[in-house]
């Protein structure tokens, strides 16, 4: 059984016996317990289980105790450490020197013992040794007897833990390419060095003929298929056929295609994670799956010119429910865009919520909207907006039909209820695919995302000579007047899922205007997640040594390892590039 990755908590202490160490034992160990309690009571794994922490077997005052802690952590699948102390300790003697996992240190801000002095000393040792560590130091002085974790310290501990867990969850998993390069898209030219060295992942690949092989040979669960077909007929609405008359398929052919795309979903899922039912049917090898945390399907054009497209498969893999009930989503990239798949994966592991995959299709200026519709933009839309629309697939959670406190959200599967599932289905239809694009047919996904949701759009790009770089745009979804929406939406493909997005502007750099955001976006795709998580993404990127080339996160929310400041404190973007370049990938 594969263990969850855990956070290791290291209570370090002044090693001097005969009074000093003894007086600090309880306080120091209680700090460790309080951090473990905070993390386990606040954060969850993608399966909904509380995050697990492992505390060192004793306080750490000298090297043998540091070594004992290290041995325990190796056996316990610890993916990151947090060192805590209220006092002076011996810096390089007590530090964790594992170079391939993240480290953080919380030095208690008190006057009785110099926790801050240890923090500064051990962070200097980390910098000297080239092992980055995050420094956490409360803004306000606390009493020595105060066991509460200050709010600013909590925020940093949780931000660090979320990002560190993401590194652990990715490690030793796989990206599965179903097919190869789609239409010359750079992101679907999968780079195994990037996955191995930055994420600790491997790459696997299957030809798209694996889908037809499994269909022809019955390598899927026939009982599940019958149940799925019944559920789809009862719950999934076929949309209006926008094709010209000579391209409209017969009712009989459409019915056959519904059966085909349901099988595609089942096979795509089984390829990613396996299915023990296949072993019962005599297909032991296929039952294992590919241990894929994220996958992509090429589709265009070799598949879609001949077979029904992958829109239904992609939509329901990225959605948190199907005929088997509510479940955690998969992370699945259209057009095998592995870089957008990784962008979705970063978002998912930080939030435990499903992800919107979209083309960053159009910038609509206020002037253009008024010319086309006669409507003057206002509110969050006043400076213009971006049309985010994928060519036929999107998680149904992207409808925004789930709610929290009466507001539209995308939330973890364990918070979802059946009424929200039905609302998503009722507000979505599945039109026959545009056969000028998809000659083999299939069914696309059509909905409109509800407005006023805080979201973050993310994209990972590869830059020759530099490596991966990350860009982040926080903003809000918009709800336009119905007639304005229809006028703008019908200028593209009315059978595809639409999200109207207004990035938050800062007045400088790439965020001077919405046009500048569009103009500086590094690729044709973006991954959109619920919530403003840019600060968490910046922390995660620093752990992986991926520089951030564009973001609109307030400077006070940026949390990177302490030694980043030694690369410069005025121009943080340049310092980030220098630090990542010098330190190199986390897993190299």
UniProtKB/Swiss-Prot annotation:
Belongs to the L-fucose isomerase family. Pfam families: Fucose_iso_C, Fucose_iso_N1, Fucose_iso_N2. GO terms for molecular function: arabinose isomerase activity; L-fucose isomerase activity; manganese ion binding. Signal peptide: none annotated. Pathway: Carbohydrate degradation; L-fucose degradation; L-lactaldehyde and glycerone phosphate from L-fucose: step 1/3. InterPro entries: Fuc/Ara_isomerase_C, Fuc_iso_dom3_sf, Fuc_isomerase_C, Fucose_iso_dom1_sf, Fucose_iso_N1, Fucose_isomerase, Fucose_isomerase_dom2_sf, Fucose_isomerase_N/cen_sf. Mn(2+) binds at residues 335, 359, 525. HAMAP family: Fucose_iso. It catalyses: L-fucose = L-fuculose. Converts the aldose L-fucose into the corresponding ketose L-fuculose. GO terms for biological process: D-arabinose catabolic process; L-fucose catabolic process. One of its GO terms (cellular component) is cytoplasm. This is L-fucose isomerase. Its EC number is 5.3.1.25. The active site is at 335 (proton acceptor), 359 (proton acceptor). The keyword ATP-binding does not apply. CDD domains: L-fucose_isomerase (cd03556). It is an enzyme of class 5 (isomerase). It comes from Streptococcus pneumoniae serotype 2 (strain D39 / NCTC 7466).
């Amino acid at each position: 059984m594969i263990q969850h990755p855990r956070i290791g908590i290291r209570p370090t202490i002044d090693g001097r016996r005969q009074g000093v160490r003894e007086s600090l034992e309880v306080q120091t160990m209680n700090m460790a317990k309080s951090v473990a309690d905070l993390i386990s009571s606040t954060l969850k794994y993608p399966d909904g289980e509380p995050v697990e922490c492992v505390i060192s077997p004793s306080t750490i005052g000298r090297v043998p105790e540091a070594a004992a802690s290290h041995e325990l952590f190796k056996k316990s699948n610890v993916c990151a450490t947090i060192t805590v102390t209220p006092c002076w300790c011996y810096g390089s003697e007590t530090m964790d020197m594992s170079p391939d996992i993240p480290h953080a240190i919380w030095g208690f801000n008190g006057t009785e013992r110099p926790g801050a002095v240890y923090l500064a000393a051990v962070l200097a040792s980390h910098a000297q040794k080239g092992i980055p560590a995050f420094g956490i130091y409360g803004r306000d002085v606390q009493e020595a007897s105060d066991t509460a974790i200050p709010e600013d310290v909590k925020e940093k501990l949780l931000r660090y833990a979320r990002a560190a867990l993401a590194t652990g969850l990715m490690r030793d998993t796989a990206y599965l390419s179903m097919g190869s390069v789609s239409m010359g898209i750079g992101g679907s030219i999968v780079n195994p060095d990037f996955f191995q060295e930055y994420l600790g992942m491997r790459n696997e690949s299957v030809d798209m003929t694996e889908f037809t092989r499994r269909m022809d040979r019955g390598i899927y669960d026939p009982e599940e298929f019958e149940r799925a077909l019944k559920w789809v007929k009862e719950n999934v609405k076929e949309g209006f056929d926008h094709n010209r008359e000579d391209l409209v398929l017969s009712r009989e052919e459409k019915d056959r295609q519904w059966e085909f795309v349901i099988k595609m979903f089942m096979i795509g899922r089984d390829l990613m994670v396996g299915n023990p039912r296949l072993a019962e049917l005599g297909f032991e090898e296929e039952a294992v799956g590919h241990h894929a945390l994220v996958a992509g399907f090429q589709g265009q054009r070799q598949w879609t010119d001949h077979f029904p497209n992958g829109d239904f498969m992609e939509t329901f893999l990225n959605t948190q429910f199907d005929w088997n009930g509510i479940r955690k989503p998969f992370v699945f990239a259209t057009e095998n865009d592995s870089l957008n798949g990784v962008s979705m994966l970063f978002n998912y592991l930080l939030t435990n919520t499903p992800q919107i995959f979209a083309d960053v299709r159009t910038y609509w200026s206020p002037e253009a909207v008024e010319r086309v519709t006669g409507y003057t933009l206002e509110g969050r839309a006043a400076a213009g907006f971006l049309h985010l629309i994928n060519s036929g697939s999107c998680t149904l959670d992207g409808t925004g039909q789930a709610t929290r406190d009466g507001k539209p959200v995308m939330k973890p599967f364990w918070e979802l209820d059946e009424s929200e599932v039905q609302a998503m289905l009722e507000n979505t239809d599945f039109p026959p695919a545009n056969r000028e694009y998809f000659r083999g047919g299939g069914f696309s996904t059509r909905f409109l995302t509800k407005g006023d949701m805080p979201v973050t759009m993310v994209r990972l790009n590869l830059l020759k000579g530099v490596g991966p770089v990350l860009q982040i745009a926080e903003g809000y979804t918009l709800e336009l007047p119905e007639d304005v929406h229809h006028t703008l939406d019908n200028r593209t493909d009315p059978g595809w899922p639409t999200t109207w997005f207004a990035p938050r502007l800062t007045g400088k750099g790439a965020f001077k205007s919405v046009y500048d955001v569009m103009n500086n976006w590094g690729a044709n795709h973006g991954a959109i997640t619920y919530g403003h998580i840019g600060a968490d993404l910046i922390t995660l990127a620093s752990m992986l040594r991926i520089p951030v080339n564009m973001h609109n996160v307030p400077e006070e929310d940026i949390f990177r390892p302490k030694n980043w400041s030694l690369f410069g404190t005025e121009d943080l973007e340049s310092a980030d590039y220098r630090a990542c370049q010098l330190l190199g990938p986390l897993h190299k």
